[in-house]
Amino acid sequence: TPFNDREMLELFLTAQENGRKYPTEAEFEAAGFNLIDLEFARSHVRPRAILKDKSKNLYPNIYENRNLWMNIPMGVGKAIGGYPSSTFSDDTYSMWNYTNLFGSWNHGLFQAPGSWVDAAHKNGTDIFSGIKFFESWTPGSESAKYREMITAKNPDGSFKYAEAFINCLMFFGTDGINYSWEDTGYAD
């Protein structure tokens, strides 16, 4: 899939090196993207402020400025996971207006469905796109290779992929990333 985290960062790094924030349509197509499919992963809705109206709370004494972070899998992972399908449970999340921050842990970093990001933003919810696991227990885990790539630095000491990473998140409209802290891979 062209949504491979490494390939996506390289694509956005190339755009940055050519003086642009985002790849061109031709660059996306050359990387294997169908432009119509790419739009399923893009959000086109700017975030709204979260609705806070104590008079509409079922329990009026609940702390008005509560912050709920919902961190659950979407749908069935990379197989469908929130993209259009005939499986109702893959497409449904109905608690956006109660959630301040949503994080899904079964998509790649840049692969959350744009419709989910749109729904989140319409309800004042920030949304993380997918997750990156840095774990040693999964056979074939490539976390060491990814860690080596993401910590690469430019000659001036800045991180090589930092701006490309931010531009990629901005292009897709997501508000951040989700990292699993369950292993020792964060030491560096």
Model segments located where?
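Chitinase-like catalytic core of GlcNAc-active glycosidases
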Residues: 61-188
